[in-house]
Amino acid sequence: MAEFIKLPVGIENFEKIRRDGFYYVDKTGLIEQLLNNWGEVNLFTRPRRFGKTLNMSMLKCFFEIGTDQSLFEGLYISKNKALCDAYMGKYPVISISLKGVNADSYENARSLLKRIVMEEAKMHRIIMSGNRLDDIDKAEYMSLVTGDMGEDTLVYSMKTLTALLEKYYEKKVIVLIDEYDVPLAKANENGYYDQMVLLVRNLFENVLKTNSSLKFAVLTGCLRVAKESIFTGLNNFKTNSILDEEYDETFGLSLIHI
């Protein structure tokens, strides 16, 4: 009797899919396209169930320092040895999803956003070891981990984390933001849109604009929020939607996969 490959229904974690032998539609060509079609800030908008979150998980696994390179064996990107040697496992990565910022008030939404930053900061606690960071740096890091930050600190939190990671690793930082538009959509539904736009715009501007610690960033979402709303003044900002041919094979499924 033929052995069937398991389908990863509802699984959006690249490492789990590869380790547990689930069927994986190879989208690692996205890595090559991102690096060849360089943009410092890259926004991808696609409908739900188009593999955005899985692609972000895959990008994190590829670039992050300490990655298990065997996860990519046999996949398209592994054929590009020069690219893999230069980029695989070579960068600190900040990876957050804003999917959970779903609240009925601005105060609750802000608290949820703070929690997301706290949890991501905890993932990088290794930077507290050794003496690469001074006492001031470590105090800044602890404020992120403990959530001891007002709104003025929150809007600089991701930029602060990139600076700390760059100082520790002596490498520029890759930033991945999944479901970037959820806080804005929920704010619009619940009557605090203007406040949320200001918070998200300040957060994004600080981490994505004139940030010397940033290597590049990728954002994904379902909605194309007007650039004037939250991406004001960003240079080298690229957007790609379902209507664009570029990257059309790296999101969703084609007929040969169905």
Q: Where do the language-model regions lie?
A:
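Conserved small/polar residues in nucleotide/adenosyl-binding loops
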Residues: 256-258
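Walker A/P-loop-proximal flanking segment of P-loop NTPase domains
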Residues: 1-80
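Structural recognition of the conserved hydrophobic beta-strand(s) that form the central parallel beta-sheet
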Residues: 176-178, 215-222
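P-loop NTPase motor core
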Residues: 61-126
